[in-house]
Design a protein with these regions (language model features):
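Short cysteine/histidine-rich zinc-coordinating motifs and their immediately flanking basic loops
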Residues: 58-65
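Electrostatic cytochrome c docking/interface patches
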Residues: 19-41, 89-90
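Extracytoplasmic/secreted proteins, especially bacterial periplasmic and envelope-associated proteins
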Residues: 28-32, 76, 80, 99-106
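Short Fe-S-cluster ligation motifs
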Residues: 74-95
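C-terminal capping alpha-helices of c-type cytochrome domains
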Residues: 90-120
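The canonical Cys-X-X-Cys-His
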Residues: 42-54, 104, 108
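Bacterial N-terminal signal peptides that target proteins for export
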Residues: 1-8
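Bacterial N-terminal signal peptides
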Residues: 8-17
């Protein structure tokens, strides 16, 4: 179990570093995570509303190959983010290869790592 945790931690750190190298900005991702207007959202909710302290995230979140969100199978973490933007925030999906998505993914790596012990 320790080995798996260490590998997942290393993967998260690596993923965050790759994001930074590719121009992703975790600080900008944090701002996006906290604003209710992401994707033109109209519900008044932000990502943080549902995921405060990493709720519903684990170290495995970043590396999963398949996700199940509200009973719906989703193939990528970017797809999960867009699902939440469309359903919870009542906005429009953002480009999966766009700067906002890269910034959010970079921030999520850090956010999940920092909150992995609090989300249980």
């Amino acid at each position: 179990m320790k080995t798996i945790t260490m590998l997942l931690t290393a993967f998260c750190i690596f993923f965050a570093a790759i994001g930074i190298c590719l121009g992703a900005d975790a600080q900008q991702g944090k701002l996006l995570f906290e604003i209710p207007t992401l994707g033109g959202g109209t519900s008044g909710k932000s990502c943080l509303t549902c995921h405060e302290h990493g709720r519903d995230f684990s170290l495995k979140t970043i590396s999963k190959k398949q996700y199940l969100v509200m009973g719906n199978p989703v193939g990528t973490l970017a797809g999960v983010i867009n699902f939440c933007i469309e359903v919870a925030l009542r906005g429009e999906a953002i480009a999966e290869n766009g700067q906002e998505m890269h910034d959010l993914l970079a921030y999520l790596s850090v956010f999940i790592q920092n909150n992995s012990d609090k989300s249980q």
